[in-house]
Structures are given as structure tokens and as C-alpha cells.
UniProtKB/Swiss-Prot annotation:
Full protein name: Interferon-induced GTP-binding protein Mx1
UniProt topology in membrane: Peripheral membrane protein
Residue ranges, annotated region (G4 motif): 247-250
Primary location class: cytoplasm
Pfam families (alphabetical): Dynamin_M (PF01031), Dynamin_N (PF00350), GED (PF02212)
Length: 662
């Protein structure tokens, strides 16, 4: 709440004749106020304004602006629109002036009204530099120095912030961000793309929902043609957080004053927050070294005497003091409106950073004994995750699949390969049987089953499965290796030597286990070349095949052996061999479909994981390598420190928001 003349008049009518100046030496006017009125106003101020301002100031002091946008007012306008003059009038200090681009870096102007102090204080800070200022006349020089340091001494601009803090009895409680004036064409030493760069910088600020756009427009131009208002409308089409400020009313052409009044009364280009009109120091007044306090007095007289604009003064829409009051009121309202969203953002950021910090773990201890315990914890966590993988109990996200589930899919594919291999087309199998009958039957009489034919076909069909089994071994091995590597990344990512060592162990053990697994798979298929099955098991399987054939014959769905009708004895021999093949296939497929996955699981999951766990524990035996293994990536420590600082800021911010009376 800015102490306006209206407020003072209500508190003490006798004081109404003494204007309260926001800039320059206002002490004389302040001393003339009655003590009762002053106490009353201070009480109102403390109750309504200070809690909101102090909350945001405290969050800003914590550095929360590094994490989240806080409510503020951004001042934008076309070049030479009078932005600097408005800011000077509000802050009471002279800011850089001149031709071309004067504001080359975003200037955060933090104004804090002192209630019980008379001393003026200022501070300029940028990058790692900070300087206290005790004389308002030094501000312009320090701002120019800051801009030259950040953006160079040419005409370029920078996104880097300069912060000017002013504490005084004569300023309103506001946070303003002064942005470079919009230019369309590069002139002189300006970069060719200066216009684009400035617009990009401005949009970065005004698109934030937490920012009120204060659009400065000269009164003597067509408001519809101003770039600044167009940019504000682009990011705030409803005009919910845009305020229009008309400047230079003394330069309005005669006969057009009523159009200016219509603009201020929101009848031309509608903004929900409306418009204000102010008259700041002109160029001649600046050259004549007119003080800011005197300029405010002249402004008041100008509007009081103006035949068109005096009504705007009576409506509270004219003069810098009224503007200051409106801006403070708007900022307070905006703060209160933004607090629920800000609270949610802080809570969500706090949770996100907490989770991110957990990935970086705690700092590596300096003490050697502590390093050993630290490394033990790291390796134990890794080994526990490997155990979870082996047992099929690892934690996965909603969209992820457990390793064992993926392995089961591969084993299911293997059973399909076996089934497809054994279930050849009956005509193809019949031709194969006839070939072996003609090739190997010898002197046996027709109708007798040739065991050599049966055995040869069985061996060939089983042999055909050997390479697919080895391929499955390689596929599963890659899946397990990648899963183990992911566990290493999860646990050791920030310790590149430890992660690299774990990857080396993973690869070495993989190669060894894969060789052993392949050796046993090939041994199994060598054993499968011995055609064997328990007698009672085989008899049972053969009986089932024959019963099934008999049932199908009854239903007139017997196998088609029409191509081999040379004799009933040949038919009988063919069918007999076919039945034996089907019976043996059933039993052999049971063995192979289960035994090969068991071999792969044993070597490439169980033993692989256990050997890896032992190898990682062996790292603890060499104490001289602890420091090397626990060496972090160059930015890990800095990142952890950065996250801790952010977390501390957000924790304090949550606490202060919780304590805010609301």
C-alpha cells in the first residue's frame, strides 16, 4: 500500500495540502503529517502490505528465484517510449540515459519502503560482484559499469540480470524488471539481429504467469501500432496481467486530447487492469537538472490545470504517486493470487529435487575407514539388485518388464521352434520315410519296421535344433548382460572407475559363462544323438499315438498316404514308422524344451550373477584402490552441492509459506 495523498487526506485533512513525494527529498512533507494519521497509516500498511511483500522478499532473499518465478512487474516499451523516466520517478534515482539501446541487461529494480528509517540505502549486484551504495547519485554510474562488464562496451545485450535494490521511505514496495526497449532496425554498431534478440529476451519474462507486464506507450502515438502492447497481447490475450502506461502527455497534438482520454479510460484497446497516464521529466528538464521531487510537483500541477486530463487525475488514473499506488496494489493482489500455485510449484520441485538428489547419494567420506564402509554399502546395494534380478523380483516401472519375464518369452519361442521342427507336413515326412526305406531297408521283408530309418530321421530332426538353441543362448546372454549393466549404472554411475570396473567384470564373466553354457548345450545335443527313452514311457507314448490314429480313422480323418499305394505292406510299414516318430518326438521335445532353458538359466543367470557378486566383493580386498574406485565424475560433487542448496532453499520456502497468515 503506497501512502497516497488521498490516504493522507483521510487520515488527517490538514495534511492534504502537503503532497507525499515518492522521489527526491520528501522528508519535509512527511514531517508535516500529524502523528495520529501517521500511526494509523503505518498500522494499515503493516497489516495489509508488508506481510505479502516480506514473504516474497524473503523467498527472493533465499534465492528461490533461481528455481521458480516469483511475482514481479516487467516494464516494456518501444525504444524512447519513456520507460526510464517512469522508473526514475518510481525509484527516485537517475538511471542510464542516452540514444540507442540504454537498457542492455534486464534490470531487477527491488524497491523497499522503509517505515521507521530515514536513511537511503542502495545495492547493485551482478555475477559475483556486489556493491553497497549510500548516495543515490552513484546509481547511474554503477549500472553503466555493470552493463559494460556483462554485455561489453558496445551495443550488444545480455540475458544476465543486474539487480538494483533501493530501500527508502520515499519508494513504494515493488519489484520491477526493466527490459531493453524494442527496436526494429539495427543502427550504428548494433548487431544486425538486435531486434530479434531483444524480443526474445522480453518474451522470456512476460510469458511467465507470475509477471505483470507494465507496457509504456507515448501518448502522442497510435497505441494500436506499438510493438510492446502487441507483444504483451500475444502472451496475455485477455489482458489479465497487463497494465498500460501513457507517457509524454505534454506532447499530445491539440485536438487529439480526447482520444488519449478514451485510451486511459479503457475504451480503445481494452486491458482488464486498465491504464494510467504520467508526465515525467522531459529532455529539456533533465538538461536543466530538474530534481525528481520538483518534477512530481510540476506533474501534479500539469494535470490539475489541464482541461482534458484533470478528470483523469480526479479518477486516480494520473500522476506517478497514483501509478505507484496502483502498482503496489496490483502486485499485492497478484502475489495473493499466485501463492497457491507457488506453493504447489515449491512442493513439486522439492519432491523432484529430493528424488534427483537420491540418485547422487551422499558425499564420499575423506577418512579411509569410512571409505571402506561407504564402498561396502555401494557394493552391497549392487549385489542386492543383482539378487533381485536373478530371483525375478526386481522393481520395474509401469512400462517396463522384468528380466525373467523377458527370458520366459524367449523360452516360449524355443518351444515353438521345437514344435515346428517336429511337426513337418505329413507328405514331406512320408517322402523322407520312403527315401530311407529305399536306401537302408536291405533284405528285410515288406511290412517290418526298419529301425535304421526311424533312428536316422530322429537324429537329423534333433540335430537341426542345435544351432537355434545356441542362438537362444546368445540372445539371453545379451539380455542378462544389459540388465546387469543397468544395475551398475544405477549404483555406480557417478563413480566412473567403479562403474568401468563393474562393466569389465560383467563382460569377463559373461564370456566365460557363455562358453561353458554353449559347451553344455552342444554336449546335450551330442547325447540326444543316442536315441533313447525309458521303455514304459515310450510304450505309453506310442499307445497314445496309436489310439489317436484309430480315433481319427473312425472319424474318417486318417493321414493321406495316397501317394504310396503300391502295396498294403508298404503302407503298413510307413504308418508304423510314422507312429514311432510321433511317439519319440513327444518325449524328446519334453526333454529338450526344458533342459536347454535350464542350462541357460544356470549358466547365464544364476552362476553369472553369483560370480559377478563374488568378483565385486573381491574389490574390497585392495584398500589402496578405494580412493580410485570412489573417484566421482568432475561435476558430480558440484551437482550434489547444487541440489542440496536448492533443496535447502525450497525447504525454507515451504516453511515460510506454511507460516504465512494468508
Amino acid at each position: 500500500m503506497v501512502l497516497s495523498e488521498v490516504d493522507i487526506a483521510k487520515a488527517d485533512p490538514a495534511a492534504a495540502s502537503h503532497p507525499v513525494l515518492l522521489n527526491g527529498d520528501a522528508n519535509v512533507a512527511q514531517k508535516n503529517l500529524g502523528s495520529v494519521a501517521e500511526n494509523n497509516l503505518c498500522s494499515q500498511y503493516e497489516e495489509k502490505v508488508r506481510p505479502c511483500i516480506d514473504l516474497i522478499d524473503s523467498l527472493r532473499a533465499l534465492g528461490v528465484e533461481q528455481d521458480l518465478a516469483l511475482p514481479a512487474i516487467a516494464v516494456i516499451g518501444d525504444q524512447s517510449s519513456g520507460k526510464s523516466s517512469v522508473l526514475e520517478a518510481l525509484s527516485g534515482v537517475a538511471l542510464p540515459r542516452g540514444s540507442g539501446i540504454v537498457t542492455r541487461c534486464p534490470l531487477v529494480l527491488k524497491l523497499k519502503k522503509l517505515v521507521n528509517e530515514d536513511k537511503w540505502r542502495g545495492k547493485v549486484s551482478y555475477q559475483d560482484y556486489e556493491i553497497e551504495i549510500s548516495d543515490a547519485s552513484e546509481v547511474e554510474k554503477e549500472i553503466n559499469k555493470a552493463q559494460n562488464t556483462i554485455a561489453g562496451e558496445g551495443m550488444g545485450i545480455s540475458h544476465e540480470l543486474i539487480t538494483l535494490e533501493i530501500s527508502s521511505r520515499d519508494v513504494p514496495d515493488l519489484t520491477l524488471i526493466d527490459l531493453p526497449g524494442i527496436t526494429r532496425v539495427a543502427v550504428g554498431n548494433q548487431p544486425a539481429d538486435i531486434g530479434y534478440k531483444i524480443k526474445t529476451l522480453i518474451k522470456k519474462y512476460i510469458q511467465r504467469q507470475e509477471t505483470i507486464s507494465l507496457v509504456v506507450v507515448p501518448s502522442n502515438v497510435d497505441i494500436a501500432t506499438t510493438e510492446a502492447l502487441s507483444m504483451a497481447q500475444e502472451v496475455d490475450p485477455e489482458g489479465d496481467r497487463t497494465i498500460g502506461i501513457l507517457t509524454k502527455p505534454d506532447l499530445v497534438d491539440k485536438g487529439t486530447e480526447d482520444k488519449v482520454v478514451d485510451v486511459v479510460r479503457n475504451l480503445v484497446f481494452h486491458l482488464k487492469k486498465g491504464y494510467m497516464i504520467v508526465k515525467c521529466r522531459g529532455q529539456q528538464e533533465i538538461q536543466d537538472q530538474l530534481s525528481l521531487s520538483e518534477a512530481l510537483q510540476r506533474e501534479k500541477i500539469f494535470f490539475e490545470d489541464h482541461p482534458y486530463f484533470r478528470d483523469l487525475l480526479e479518477e486516480g488514473k494520473a500522476t506517478v504517486p497514483c501509478l505507484a499506488e496502483k502498482l503496489t496494489s496490483e502486485l499485492i493482489t497478484h502475489i495473493c493470487k499466485s501463492l497457491p500455485l507457488l506453493e504447489n510449484q515449491i512442493r513439486e520441485s522439492h519432491q523432484r529435487i529430493t528424488e534427483e538428489l537420491q540418485k547422487y547419494g551422499v558425499d564420499v567420506p575423506e577418512d579411509e575407514n569410512e571409505k571402506m564402509f561407504f564402498l561396502i554399502d555401494k557394493i552391497n546395494a549392487f549385489n542386492q539388485d543383482i539378487t533381485a534380478l536373478i530371483q525375478g523380483e526386481e522393481t520395474v516401472g509401469e512400462e517396463d518388464i522384468r528380466l525373467f519375464t523377458r527370458l520366459r518369452h524367449e523360452f516360449h519361442k524355443w518351444s515353438i521352434i521345437i514344435e515346428n521342427n517336429f511337426q513337418e507336413g505329413h507328405k514331406i515326412l512320408s517322402r523322407k520315410i520312403q527315401k530311407f526305406e529305399n536306401q537302408y531297408r536291405g533284405r528285410g521283408l515288406p511290412g517290418f519296421v526298419n529301425y535304421r530309418t526311424f533312428e536316422t530321421i530322429v537324429k537329423q530332426q534333433i540335430k537341426a535344433l542345435e544351432e537355434p538353441a545356441v542362438d537362444m543362448l546368445h540372445t539371453v546372454t545379451d539380455m542378462v548382460r544389459l540388465a546387469f549393466t543397468d544395475v551398475s549404472i544405477k549404483n555406480f554411475e557417478e563413480f566412473f572407475n567403479l562403474h568401468r570396473t563393474a562393466k569389465s567384470k560383467i563382460e569377463d564373466i559373461r564370456a566365460e559363462q557363455e562358453r561353458e553354457g554353449e559347451k553344455l548345450i552342444r554336449l546335450h545335443f551330442q547325447m540326444e544323438q543316442i536315441v533313447y527313452c525309458q521303455d514304459q514311457v515310450y510304450r505309453g507314448a506310442l499307445q497314445k499315438v496309436r489310439e489317436k490314429e484309430l480315433e481319427e480313422e473312425k472319424k474318417k480323418k486318417s493321414w493321406d498316404f495316397g501317394a504310396f499305394q503300391s502295396s498294403s505292406a508298404t503302407d503298413s510299414s510307413m504308418e508304423e514308422i510314422f507312429q514311432h516318430l510321433m511317439a519319440y518326438h513327444q518325449e524328446a521335445s519334453k526333454r529338450i524344451s526344458s533342459h536347454i532353458p535350464l542350462i541357460i538359466q544356470f549358466f547365464m543367470l544364476q552362476t553369472y550373477g553369483q560370480q559377478l557378486q563374488k568378483a565385486m566383493l573381491q574389490l574390497l580386498q585392495d584398500k589402496d584402490t578405494y580412493s580410485w574406485l570412489l573417484k566421482e565424475r568432475g561435476d558430480t560433487s558440484d551437482k550434489r552441492k547444487f541440489l542440496k542448496e536448492r533443496l535447502a532453499r525450497l525447504t525454507q520456502a515451504r516453511r515460510r509459506l506454511a507460516q504465512f497468515p494468508g
